[in-house]
Swiss-Prot record:
It comes from Rhizopus oryzae (Mucormycosis agent). It catalyses: (S)-lactate + NAD(+) = pyruvate + NADH + H(+). One of its GO terms (molecular function) is L-lactate dehydrogenase activity. Converts pyruvate to lactate. This is L-lactate dehydrogenase A. NCBIfam families: L-LDH-NAD (TIGR01771). Homotetramer. Keywords: Cytoplasm, NAD, Oxidoreductase. Substrate binds at R88, N120, R151. It is found in: Cytoplasm. Belongs to the LDH/MDH superfamily. LDH family. The active site is at H175 (proton acceptor). Its EC number is 1.1.1.27. Its main location: cytoplasm.
Amino acid sequence: MVLHSKVAIVGAGAVGASTAYALMFKNICTEIIIVDVNPDIVQAQVLDLADAASISHTPIRAGSAEEAGQADIVVITAGAKQREGEPRTKLIERNFRVLQSIIGGMQPIRPDAVILVVANPVDILTHIAKTLSGLPPNQVIGSGTYLDTTRLRVHLGDVFDVNPQSVHAFVLGEHGDSQMIAWEAASIGGQPLTSFPEFAKLDKTAISKAISGKAMEIIRLKGATFYGIGACAADLVHTIMLNRKSVHPVSVYVEKYGATFSMPAKLGWRGVEQIYEVPLTEEEEALLVKSVEALKSVEYSSTKVPEKKVHATSFSKSSC
């Protein structure tokens, strides 16, 4: 039974539209609304997607930030893009203002809503969204390393000649340069990956770089990535809506570390229902801690940016 049915996608760019498109064909939403500061791009995306909606039978329309606040699930894809030569701290500060405007415009947010942050840097923005929204930590999640994990499983599936869905392996930590692969816990058919003869031949450093660098290669060739992350975001919405209780690596607040980063989490209609500890080697644990500590320093400073009272109308004046 579908416990959630109305989804709001905040951000009508390529990622937001790709998410809407992928979600439409799952036929699980009673309604999808798209929200953006640019009315022309919203209208264009809705008109285009409406043609596909006639086949999927999922209603889609433009909506307001206030309406988004009353949706069952809110997917935030809007965010400021990094300017050439801009320090990361400045980008985060600008994205803080964007999120502040978005979430301020959504108030009052329904208390049982689930927010899924897709915009980058996703771990930091998820942490900020948790702080600004006032929702319980389990109801604010980020797409995190879900796409990275998918890429890893596809790669290992090719190496070991199995369906990627039969590969159980996770990319953990930051969705970014410091992310790490939990090799010790990886398995195929219940057999540890480390026990396969092929494992010793793997260039794990090269694989890690290829997984984390794939997005930049796509951006270099065509300017942006959106289909893969759109499909992943739609799948996460699907998991939450149907209360599937599936385990995915998503960006969540982990109390043990006091930070927001990707760990395997069971997802249901309440959002995160359980976070799983992954067995790691000492070396892997050190890499994860290093990744988390780097995020913590930024997450802490980002949530210390002085907050301003934001009204619903201010969202329409922000640049996303």
